């Protein structure tokens, strides 16, 4: 039995019913992606945030310290899912169509997604979470073009959002396969998108192991968390009550020290200079922050 999982790291583990990996030599694969997450935002990279499951996976696998990405949603996802530079895949920037090659707001037909490649090689393919590889993301519009949605780019099943961000408690752009189901989330008082993405991925894998045990699978699990909007469950907010009262200046020093201790960065690397444009935590009141926004608008 075998399953390989990739997120910030690669590792191996097990999943019930994964006979295909043993019989064919082709492992089941799970690719996990977080959204807009900082380098030190999980425990195994020096964070104060508790992430025991990710820490264990990193401890059993490989923890990368050097990387390159497109720094924004669409280009990073385009590269991740095609193996190409973002411009080669057609998404050198975000989703607006700039009418020039490399900036068309859709991954192009000249590239092959990992789902399309896996499917060609006999894999079942599943996706849960955020797509954000097309400018056609108004899922609630019946006539919205779907030629570049997950189902049309190699995934057998899809649950999530097509666009870049949505409400965590009632995502308007929620989609199942090619059908808009935003109202389902709105009608569910206990709905939370992060949990729903996890539940969907687990459901796909369980169904696969029950119905197609001799076929390998690839599952892509792409959370919107911790991307804005910053919307957490009350129980999670309560867990960290008071933890950030000292402010970000103290926090950044603590993280820097932990990263050195953990061997993630060299002790010779000093803490980066503080951005003087950022207010000290004690001064970051709503009125002060609002004033900063107003100043920026006047300049632009």
Locations of regions flagged by a protein language model:
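Formylglycine-dependent sulfatase
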Residues: 1-9, 13-300
């Amino acid at each position: 039995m075998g399953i390989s999982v990739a997120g910030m790291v690669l590792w191996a583990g097990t999943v019930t019913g994964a006979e295909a990996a043993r019989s064919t030599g082709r492992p089941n694969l799970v690719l996990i992606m977080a959204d807009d997450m900082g380098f030190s935002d999980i425990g195994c990279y020096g964070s104060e945030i508790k992430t025991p499951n990710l820490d264990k996976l990193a401890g059993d696998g490989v923890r990368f310290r050097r990387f390159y990405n497109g720094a924004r949603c669409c280009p990073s996802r385009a590269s991740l899912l095609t193996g190409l530079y973002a411009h080669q895949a057609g998404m050198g920037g975000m989703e607006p169509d700039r009418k020039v090659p490399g900036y068309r707001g859709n991954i192009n037909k000249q590239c092959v997604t990992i789902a399309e490649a896996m499917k060609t090689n006999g894999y079942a393919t599943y996706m849960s979470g955020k797509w954000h590889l097309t400018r056609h993301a108004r899922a609630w519009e019946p006539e919205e073009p779907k030629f570049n949605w997950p189902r049309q780019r190699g995934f057998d099943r899809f649950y999530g959002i097509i666009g870049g961000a949505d409400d965590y408690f009632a995502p308007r752009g929620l989609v199942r396969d090619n059908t808009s189901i935003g109202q389902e989330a709105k009608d569910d008082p206990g709905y939370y998108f992060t949990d729903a993405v996890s539940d969907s991925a687990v459901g796909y894998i369980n169904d696969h192991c029950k119905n197609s045990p001799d076929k390998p699978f690839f599952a892509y699990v792409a959370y919107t968390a911790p991307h804005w909007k910053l919307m957490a469950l009350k129980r999670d907010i309560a867990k960290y009550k008071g933890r950030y009262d000292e402010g970000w200046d103290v926090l950044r020093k603590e993280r820097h020290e932990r990263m050195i201790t953990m061997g993630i960065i060299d002790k010779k690397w000093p803490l980066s200079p503080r951005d003087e444009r950022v207010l000290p935590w004690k001064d970051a009141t709503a009125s002060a922050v609002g004033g900063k926004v107003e100043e920026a608008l006047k300049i632009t």
